[in-house]
Amino acid sequence: MGQEQVTTPLSAALDAGRINHAYLFSGPRGCGKTSSARIMARSLNCEHGPTSTPCGKCDSCVSLAPGGPGNLDVTELDAASHNGVEDMRELRDRAYYAPAESRYRIFIIDEAHMISPSGANALLKVVEEPPEHVIFIFATTEPEKIIGTIRSRTHHYPFRLLTPPAMKGLLQRTVAAEGVHVEDAVYPMVIEAGGGSPRDTLSLLDQLLAGAGPDGLTYDLARPLLGVTDVSLLDDAIDTLANQNKPGLFAMVDHVIEAGHDPRRFAIDLLDRLRDLMILQAVPGAIEAGLVSAPTDRASVLTAQAQRFSGPQLTYLAS
């Protein structure tokens, strides 16, 4: 989801039978690299494959499905804890054995940038001259740290963080599957807190859904758990700035501290609001276009706030 720059060419290669012996999946943490590597293993070893659409019914697909028992021919290695020369030699030796029951013997190496220089050199020969039945999938957040002689043998697919519209679609499908009502104002908070990482964002949503009440997941329930500044407090701060009410602004900061809020978080959220107003001045339909993460029912309020300032005023306040 949201990784078309990877899925489109990779699907075409699988369907055409253009299989390489080493792949490199890179990108920020939590963006789906390792999960995609597992899906690719299913695609490669499906009885009807290699295919971009594994059947999900054959023994290989069932064993590699989420919650499945696993497959002897697909090995996952966490290079953060198994990165030494002996670990790589063992992996290299195993690579020369033919698959027990599948088309390919696949090695998924997570955190591949953590492999030690001596370990990488031990692995190099089998990556350079692999048996026909072996495929390596390296996953890493720092591809530049993988030695060039290995990196040059791979097909490199860069993953990226999800955009807010794509993330909202993912959250809405998850919520629909759970059957829990979630207020529209909750989504922007969860999306921002997740930082574009599907894994982190879904983890936050799962935590919030676990504590949902009879009315579902409301803004008032989610906001304190996420540590986000209340929108009404930000609205008051914007009104104070627009009216150039300096005493009122100092009184508001005192209120933030006395109420137990994090002053640093208040400052960050206020800067984010000023940034949103600057975008709305430049692009009136920014909320609908997904440039500003806010519920659609807040569009008129934010637009009115943006109109109370000139462009230079917002720039000055944000600086």
Residue ranges of predicted features:
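Extended, largely alpha-helical regulatory/partner-binding modules appended to the mid-to-C-terminal parts
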Residues: 59, 63-70, 87-90, 103, ...
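P-loop/Walker A NTP-binding region and its immediately flanking N-terminal helices
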Residues: 1-156, 174
